[in-house]
Amino acid sequence: MLRTIGTKASGITFRGVRFQSTNPTVKKSKPLRKFLFRLGLLTGVFYAGGVAVSLKNDIVQDAFIEHVPLGEALLDFTEYYVNHPEELSFSSTKQKLQNFDKTVLIPKRGVQSAKVEDVEHIKNVTRGSADESVSLSKTIYSNLNLPSIDLEFKDEVLQSSVEHLNHLIDTIRTQVNTVDLLPQVEQLKSSIKELGSKYNSFVTDRNTAVEEALAKLDDELKTKYQNKELALTDKYISDLQETKRQIELKHDQILAKELDTAQRRILLEAENIIVQARINTLSEFESIISDKIDNERNGKLKNLDALAKRVEELENVQIKLFDNISNAEKLTNLKKTVSKINRLLISSNDGVDAKTLINEVNKFKTYSKDLNNELISSVLLNLPNDKALSNGVLSQAQLLARWDLLTPELRSASLLPPNAGILGHLSSKLFSFFLLGKSGTPTSGNDIESVISRVHDNLLKNRLDDALEEVSSLKGWSRKLSEDWIVEARKKLELQVLVGVLENEVSLL
């Protein structure tokens, strides 16, 4: 059983065993270390960002080199390794580290390193007056990683020079003795000399060709400039002459207009002077007459006022008489026009001439303008327009003739069955010849023969309204066939009715 013996501030005792409590230790803050770490980090970020931006932008690069310490050296270092990435390869880095382990004995420079390997014995080459021994050591050459020139030229001299350079680079990679390089160097020198001579001849030929081309181009430009100058001169002369001609023409027009205006102004002023002189003369004459009348009023001209009043009454009577005569003349013309229109509609056998009918209707409209009669104005508005009357109006005989021509088609249409085809039309046309027509007093039936007989009788008796009513009662295909006849008959009937109304109204005026 767990029993607590005692409790202290520094620990707890369980069953006689004291357990010491451990409080967590507080770490001391080191602000200087944090500051240096942050400063180094920010400096590294600043330099890395500055180098990266300077490689992309020349303006930033100039400012970075000029104002940032060690900016130029750091930028050169970065550009070198950017342009020579092979220097950062693993093999190259390893080789450099191996070379760092070797020391080379340099004369007069102190104690030799103990880590130098494969060092040959130092030989005395020269002895000076100071009796100093100069130690030379053979430098340990490592294999150089020089890249070859990977270029191809069509020119044999350039290609040969490139091959010699590549051969020299290969020799430098593998050999250390400079005596073996002499043939390659001589060949390279001869290739370079040949290349230089060829380059000089090329430059000479190019300069000569450029000078010739420039001279030729100069001549062409001079010729073109002269031709252009002549053309522009001719154009400017022609434009100047044309402008001069237009200015002269415009000046002549303005001068003529001003002369005409001045002449009109002078004539108007003269006319005004003459009119003013006449007015002054009349005023003087009126004043003289007025004085004489005033002087003679009490003598010979006592009854002058009564005479003037009588003359005014006579003038009013004369004006009324002239108005009555004018109205009578207008009414006479209206009656003549209406009678002529009615006569054209009734008595013509060859149809009503459209031009004559339109002229008479327009005359009637002209004569009736000053009457102010509402009935006549309303009838004139309901008359067919000139476009509707341009095709003329059929006479009674023409309507009868057209009805007779339409009768066989109506008989044939009356025999058509519903939804008739070609055979139905042919059979109805054939059987229509065997129908017996009705004549004499019309019957009261509704069959097609009774309708044809009644219409024919009404047309003979000049009852166009009854005939039109009978034809309008037709239905179906028969009504469709007679549509044109109904239009012509209705136009004639409307004209007859309206002209009759006009004739009655004019007779009552």
Curated annotation (Swiss-Prot):
GO terms for biological process: cristae formation. The chain crosses the membrane at residues 35-54. The keyword ATP-binding does not apply. Keywords: Coiled coil, Membrane, Mitochondrion, Mitochondrion inner membrane, Transit peptide, Transmembrane, Transmembrane helix. It holds the Pfam family Mitofilin. Residues 202-257, 293-330 form a coiled coil. Residues 55-509 are mitochondrial intermembrane. It comes from the Eukaryota. It is found in: Mitochondrion inner membrane. It is a single-pass membrane protein. GO terms for cellular component: MICOS complex. InterPro entries: MIC60 (IPR019133). Residues 20-34 are mitochondrial matrix. Residues 1-19 form a transit peptide. Component of the MICOS complex, a large protein complex of the mitochondrial inner membrane that plays crucial roles in the maintenance of crista junctions, inner membrane architecture, and formation of contact sites to the outer membrane. Plays a role in keeping cristae membranes connected to the inner boundary membrane. Also promotes protein import via the mitochondrial intermembrane space assembly (MIA) pathway. Belongs to the MICOS complex subunit Mic60 family. Component of the mitochondrial contact site and cristae organizing system (MICOS) complex. This is MICOS complex subunit MIC60. The lineage of its organism: Eukaryota, Fungi, Dikarya, Ascomycota, Saccharomycotina. The gene is MIC60.
